[in-house]
Amino acid sequence: LSQLGTVSAVNFDNEFSVQFAQLDNQLDEDSKLQAATIFDGLRVISNHYQHSSTPVFLGGLFAYDLVANFIPMQGVELKDDGINCPDYSFYLAENLITIDHQSQQATLKSFCFSQEEQVEVAKTALSISQKLKNIDGVLSIKAASDKVSTNFEDPEFIGIVKALKHHINIGDVFQIVPSRRFSLACPNTLASYAQLKHNNPSPYMFYMNDEDFILFGASPESALKYAPDNRQLEIYPIAGSRPRGFD
């Protein structure tokens, strides 16, 4: 990592930071592709364990705003959205629980990345194993408030949509996806995710419980839905699909 950016220690808890230089927008496309970016830090970790006899889990999230680090957007200012979630967050699991939904079985896997951590990782794995044996299968559910807030009121959002329609009409763009955020209290995120999974069993679902945020959701697409009462199959195509042109 020291070959890609400036490495500095953060504290005494085996943490460090890597500062990458900002991408020079004056570079040609080939040079941009070869320049070091924050993704290279992820590649270093991924490549280090790609030949491991037991595959390790490395996963996380990229935020849409991360594109500003690679594509110059003149005149566009990214404002604080008030959501305490980073643009780039990944996890290398020491203890991993894999679930086979068909057999209803869970498997605990532990990974030790240094000899000094063997005892601690083993203790943590044993603690998790004991908790799994005594887990309560019923999630407690609390009634949520029905008070909903939004980041755009109706008149303001209508004005935004009209402005975007104008850009489509004059040929600036052919597709725009405006967003509007609705917020309400969520006293039990895991129970809410379970209900979402029941109502919308999408193959594109996620639940991330970080120290600073909890993020869960599902894409509206469903791989396949089957209704036993009328023996009907139903699919939802990927959003944004459009017919192939004839020119």
Regions from the PLM with identified roles:
Residues L1-D247:
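Extended alpha-helical targeting/anchoring segments
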